[in-house]
Amino acid sequence: MLMPKKVKYRKQMKGRMTGTPQRGVELAFGDFGLQATECGWLDSRQIEAARIAMTRYIKRGGKIWIRIFPDKPLTSKPAETRMGKGKGSPDSWVCVIKPGRILYEMEGVTEEVAREAFRLAAHKLPVASKFITRTEINEG
């Protein structure tokens, strides 16, 4: 699973999922990409599940880049614990996703293969996303 090696602070505030991303909105490596169209949190398990779905479909052809990283700790309190007594301990890691953020990139395969691989990956993710190509970005 993806997680930071070391963090400055063990726990973080929840925050608000508003606005648009400042970076990570254009294809940087591949010819095709999966772009988020709504905001949400992606768990490290969900990121990995989508990656596995894509790699299994494209088999040995092509290259995949993961453009997101879970760097926000989620805390949880143990089951059957009374309220109060402070914030819970870090439980899992999430990545904050805003609309327009590129999640994955791919190259070395045809557009049909890439489109189907990203469709399979999108089913594993809790945020709505769309398929984009490098030519669409250059034209628009």
From Swiss-Prot:
UniProt xrefs under PROSITE patterns: RIBOSOMAL_L16_1, RIBOSOMAL_L16_2
Keywords: Ribonucleoprotein, Ribosomal protein, RNA-binding, rRNA-binding, tRNA-binding
Leader sequence residues: none
One term under GO cellular component: cytosolic large ribosomal subunit
Pfam families: Ribosomal_L16
SUPFAM superfamilies for the chain: Ribosomal protein L16p/L10e (SSF54686)
Gene Ontology biological process: translation
Single GO term (MF): tRNA binding
Coiled coil: none
Subunit and partners: Part of the 50S ribosomal subunit.
Family, per entry: Belongs to the universal ribosomal protein uL16 family.
Function: Binds 23S rRNA and is also seen to make contacts with the A and possibly P site tRNAs.
NCBIfam families according to UniProt: rplP_bact (TIGR01164)
Protein's recorded name: Large ribosomal subunit protein uL16
Taxonomic classification: Bacteria, Pseudomonadati, Thermodesulfobacteriota, Desulfuromonadia, Geobacterales
